[in-house]
Amino acid sequence: MEQAPEDQGPQREPYNEWTIEILEELKREAVRHFPRPWLHDLGQHIYNNYGDTWEGVEAIIRILQQLLFIHFRIGCHHSRIGILRQRRGGNGASRS
């Protein structure tokens, strides 16, 4: 008779610690790409609907992931090192 394999992987952090770390990382990235008032309003919306619960944390993580994914998919014009990319002319004639 087959038996389920034993869990031999590395020990994971507790779920709530991992979740908070993910949320903090998403928040840091989100403030680089979206206006703070939008993010504040999103936080208020989540709080009004979920209160101070893990379900609310999971909801805001899901929404931030979706927003960032769409933002990057459409074409983010923010640089990860703080330098905005300049758009070149179509024929490249402005090169020196």
From Swiss-Prot:
List of residues that carry Phosphoserine: S79, S94, S96
InterPro entries the record matches: RetroV_VpR/X
GO CC annotations on file: host cell; host cell nucleus; host extracellular space; virion component
Annotated region described as Homooligomerization, given as residue ranges: 1-42
PTM characteristics: Phosphorylated on several residues by host. These phosphorylations regulate VPR activity for the nuclear import of the HIV-1 pre-integration complex.
Alphabetical keyword list: Activator, AIDS, Apoptosis, Cell cycle, Host G2/M cell cycle arrest by virus, Host nucleus, Host-virus interaction, Ion channel, Ion transport, Modulation of host cell cycle by virus, Phosphoprotein, Transcription, Transcription regulation, Transport, Viral penetration into host nucleus, Virion, Virus entry into host cell
Subcellular location, record wording: Virion; Host nucleus; Host extracellular space
GO terms for biological process, alphabetical: DNA-templated transcription; monoatomic ion transmembrane transport; protein homooligomerization; regulation of DNA-templated transcription; symbiont entry into host cell; symbiont-mediated activation of host apoptosis; symbiont-mediated arrest of host cell cycle during G2/M transition; viral penetration into host nucleus
Extra remark beyond the main annotation: HIV-1 lineages are divided in three main groups, M (for Major), O (for Outlier), and N (for New, or Non-M, Non-O). The vast majority of strains found worldwide belong to the group M. Group O seems to be endemic to and largely confined to Cameroon and neighboring countries in West Central Africa, where these viruses represent a small minority of HIV-1 strains. The group N is represented by a limited number of isolates from Cameroonian persons. The group M is further subdivided in 9 clades or subtypes (A to D, F to H, J and K).
Complexes and interactors: Homooligomer, may form homodimer. Interacts with p6-gag region of the Pr55 Gag precursor protein through a (Leu-X-X)4 motif near the C-terminus of the P6gag protein. Interacts with host UNG. May interact with host RAD23A/HHR23A. Interacts with host VPRBP/DCAF1, leading to hijack the CUL4A-RBX1-DDB1-DCAF1/VPRBP complex, mediating ubiquitination of host proteins such as TERT and ZGPAT and arrest of the cell cycle in G2 phase.
Family: Belongs to the HIV-1 VPR protein family.
Stated role: During virus replication, may deplete host UNG protein, and incude G2-M cell cycle arrest. Acts by targeting specific host proteins for degradation by the 26S proteasome, through association with the cellular CUL4A-DDB1 E3 ligase complex by direct interaction with host VPRPB/DCAF-1. Cell cycle arrest reportedly occurs within hours of infection and is not blocked by antiviral agents, suggesting that it is initiated by the VPR carried into the virion. Additionally, VPR induces apoptosis in a cell cycle dependent manner suggesting that these two effects are mechanistically linked.
Protein's UniProt name: Protein Vpr
Organism: Human immunodeficiency virus type 1 group M subtype K (isolate 97ZR-EQTB11)
Lineage start: Viruses, Riboviria, Pararnavirae, Artverviricota, Revtraviricetes
